[in-house]
């Protein structure tokens, strides 16, 4: 017969007693682990800011949150965006845009482009899987989008990779648990 305490003795301590591991570390080890964690976070932020500069988009990577663009993109697809202002917007192009009063950007296809005599361009969008255009999504009284509304244009995608983000937003406790485990792993990981 195996006692419960005997089973725990064979498991790595970091999986059972995080605070016990922290107490066993000397101050230098703890400082090193915190610094290591800070380096990982700051590196991720620098990469993100670099992508913003390289792509010209305030959000160079987005996740498709609905099925409105099927069959082109499915819920959970990860899109890579660019937003170079000098490129003209064309009908058939897939854009990500923000509408005043809505927090979440929308991924839809440009179906009509209207150019005024003064050079201003306005355009209309629609989800591939939607019956009607997006005028019902725009702010009240707005019939067309302008270039200033565009967050980016879809240049590539990875299918279903963004489902992790959707799951974490749908189940916030899972998100916090995953972040806590990853943070604890980085802090408690020891060099071999």
Swiss-Prot record:
Active site: 68 (charge relay system), 108 (charge relay system), 134 (charge relay system)
EC number: 3.4.21.89
Localisation per UniProt entry: Endoplasmic reticulum membrane
GO biological process: signal peptide processing
Sequence intervals crossing the membrane: 29-48
Lumenal side, ranges: 49-192
Main subcellular location of this protein, as a coarse class: endoplasmic reticulum
A Pfam family assignment: Peptidase_S24
Presence of the UniProt keyword Zinc-finger in the record: no
Assigned GO CC terms: endoplasmic reticulum membrane; signal peptidase complex
Key word Protease present: yes
Domain of life of the native organism: Eukaryota
UniProt-recorded Gene Ontology molecular function terms: peptidase activity; serine-type endopeptidase activity
Protein name: Signal peptidase complex catalytic subunit SEC11C
